[in-house]
Amino acid sequence: MVKLAIDMMGGDNAPDIVLEAVQKAVEDFKDLEIILFGDEKKYNLNHERIEFRHCSEKIEMEDEPVRAIKRKKDSSMVKMAEAVKSGEADGCVSAGNTGALMSAGLFIVGRIKGVARPALVVTLPTIDGKGFVFLDVGANADAKPEHLLQYAQLGDIYAQKIRGIDNPKISLLNIGTEPAKGNSLTKKSYELLNQDHSLNFVGNIEAKTLMDGDTDVVVTDGYTGNMVLKNLEGTAKSIGKMLKDTIMSSTKNKIAGAILKKDLAEFAKKMDYSEYGGSVLLGLEGTVVKAHGSSNAKAFYSAIRQAKIAGEQNIVQTMKETVGESNE
């Protein structure tokens, strides 16, 4: 049995989509228990494997992260994180304030001893449909080569345990594929990655080929990773709007759009990274999953499923035994 703590109040569409996702999750997974934190006036579920706990406060999207965690002690996010810290829950899921959740993860759940800096990881789509693991996408704006090596080690574990990939291929995001390309960070990182024979490091990868499906894990610093992630999100939205405008521009195109409707829907599904769940803060003493702030019920459900798999696979213990202890 896996037990998850969930923030009912976080996100643009909370609590409705959270309640819908939680209801579906406990119906689909008979080995899942949930502790739900939020406002009792907005709670309307009744299930033997859902325990509800009232919280008098809520962390807003515009709140300053660290201050909110310190001052709003009875918020749904803080209480959720405390449940993981105490060992009462195996992991947690929230669609709330990203900075506050990372602060709660770092200061409440706690960092694994030996992990220099936790990394935020997300699974992004590829043209072949298999996707790839991408980190860091914003936990740390600055990074040293040693941090990128550790990100690769964390990503390697994540790809194996969560995505079921044996001996995943690890790549370093760079401006060229040649070993000597890049700045001092990527050059030194390349050397360290190449020297770690526990990793299947296959070299540099350029941003233009990220979605080709040639690798399983891509490592970069949080500043670059966050910009790449937002660029991909924006590009996907722009392409979708351009396609819609083109289809609606003439009767001929509308007919073609109707014929291709099923294929276009399948394409949209393949490119929707909410299918893979949320982003995960790796390197902590518990599983912390960040669902997108604008998540619908399907996306939040995927994040719950992702946290459940992490609990089943005991990913935190694996990180302690490999990345943590090896760096003490």
From Swiss-Prot:
InterPro entries, alphabetized: FA_synthesis, Phospholipid_synth_PlsX-like
Reaction(s) catalysed (UniProt annotation): a fatty acyl-[ACP] + phosphate = an acyl phosphate + holo-[ACP]
Sorted UniProt keywords: Cytoplasm, Lipid biosynthesis, Lipid metabolism, Phospholipid biosynthesis, Phospholipid metabolism, Transferase
One GO term of the biological process aspect: phospholipid biosynthetic process
GO MF term (any one): phosphate:acyl-[acyl carrier protein] acyltransferase activity
Main location: cytoplasm
Pathway the protein acts in: Lipid metabolism; phospholipid metabolism
GO cellular component, one term: cytoplasm
Enzyme kind, highest EC tier: transferase
Enzyme Commission designation: 2.3.1.274
Location in or out of the cell: Cytoplasm
UniProt cross-references to Pfam families, sorted A to Z: FA_synthesis
Transmembrane regions: none
Gene3D superfamilies: Isopropylmalate Dehydrogenase
Family per similarity comment: Belongs to the PlsX family.
General function of this protein: Catalyzes the reversible formation of acyl-phosphate (acyl-PO(4)) from acyl-[acyl-carrier-protein] (acyl-ACP). This enzyme utilizes acyl-ACP as fatty acyl donor, but not acyl-CoA.
Assembly and oligomerization: Homodimer. Probably interacts with PlsY.
Official protein name in the record: Phosphate acyltransferase
UniProt lineage: Bacteria, Bacillati, Bacillota, Bacilli, Bacillales
Gene: plsX
